[in-house]
Amino acid sequence: MKSIIEYLTHNYNEHKSLPAIKINDKKYSYEELFNKSLKVATALLENGASNETVAVIGHRNFSTYVGILGILFAGCSYTPIDPKKNKSKTIDIIRGSNIKHFIGQKSEIESLHEILAEEVSIFDNAESIITPCDTLNYLTKYNWIDLQDVEEYSPLEDFSRSDHSNLAYVLYTSGSTGKPKGVQVTVANLCSYIDAISELWKLPIGFKMS
């Protein structure tokens, strides 16, 4: 079975200049997607991420896809977070997956800062009054990667951290009947799905999927 990295690098090598993603009317090539993702991977590793779940903050935009692929290249797993949705669910996801690293655009990171600032007492089980200084100290416990700043990093060259036994992503239920529950999908699960789809559907170059 191929690894997820082998799938990604194969598509990159075969279709560098072709569109990989189309969002609204803008197209992004495999080369654009691949190169920026590798810089995200380097940023994560240089900031201490290691085979753990990383939060991607955002929506369906280019930066979010870059973040997801960068996390996979770094040998980590991702879980999506939307700060505009239920605040308590967001807190439960962060606590449930023991998130220490967050990736997003500046505005999205700031939105999450606001949510966490409101919930410092919940995280620390604090019984005392929470001051602005307490909040600032709390937020600095986490690693925040602004996707606009990753250009300063070199693209990752060593892909050996990715393993079939690693988690690929964790998706959370809505939590409508209680706390949201995380569904874990391994790299092996994801690769098996890709293998099956590849056998079932022989998709031509340029075929669009959503």
Spell out what each predicted region is.
Residues I194:
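Conserved alpha-helix/loop element of class I SAM-dependent methyltransferases that forms part
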Residues M1-C191, W201-K202:
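Carrier-protein-dependent adenylate-forming modules in NRPS/ANL systems
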